[in-house]
Amino acid sequence: MQLTHVSQNGSGAYATGGDFERIFSEEMNRLYLLGLLLTVDARKAEQCFVEGLGNSVEGNPVFREWARSWARRRIIQEAIRMMEPAKEKLTITTEPVTLEIEPRLRAILELDALERFVFVMFVLEGYSYQDCSVLLGCSRRAVVNARTRALEHLANAAEIGALHGEGLQSTYSLVSN
């Protein structure tokens, strides 16, 4: 889709505040769900959304082609800043979301914070091990181990879900599109 609005510096190559406002409006549900999967808290997910929008609009120029992925990255960065998942002990579990949520998402929400962040960033969003490591502030090995634990947990949940006729795979597409 070609945008006709030109950024303040005169170059149509960069996304404008209006472009980001449109993206956050059009993708509100997906961006909020991304924040919710990361924070497991409705208020924090909303805060990620609001701060992500504000930082996208007021932040450094971004190429227009990158604006949608940049919006998603801002949500992830806000969630990391709020939750500090690499500092959370692996044995501490987050209180479950009390909202009405897709039952198939519960397995993701039940992951420990670092596992959940790595799963969402690496598997759903396509970040590399290195990107996850840098953004989360932990070693690459910690990312690899967290991914392994997350996939094992989700595989077990999928087996249980299969017994009940539920599947996780279709749910992941809600977030990753």
What kind of region is each of these model predictions?
Residues L136-S173:
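DNA-recognition helix of helix-turn-helix
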Residues G52, F119, C132-S133, V143:
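Hydrophobic positions on the alpha-helical face of helix-turn-helix-like DNA-binding modules
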Residues M28, L33-L36, E46-K89, V97:
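Σ70-family region 2.3-2.4 aromatic/basic alpha-helix that recognizes the −10 promoter
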Residues N9, E102-D112, S139, L154:
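Short amphipathic alpha-helical boundary/capping segments
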Residues A86-L109:
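Acidic, proline/glycine-rich intrinsically disordered inter-domain spacer in sigma factors
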